[in-house]
Amino acid sequence: MDKLMQILFETTRTEYDELIWIMQHAEESAEKIEAQRARFKTAYGIIEQADLETEYEAWVKEKNS
């Protein structure tokens, strides 16, 4: 389970980072931004369904420190 959770967290963070990158580049189309936002929301939705929001936020804080 730990490996699956790690994969989910890393995937979600990657999708989030990509969303931020796309949003910071004005040449990207609104459609591309929305498509990336949907990918992030899908990944984060799995975290929500598994009631892992607290664990994910702690993991993000640890990665950022």
Set out the residue ranges of the language-model regions:
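Short, charge-rich amphipathic interface segments used for partner binding and complex assembly
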Residues: 24, 29-65
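N-terminal acidic leader/helix
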Residues: 1-34
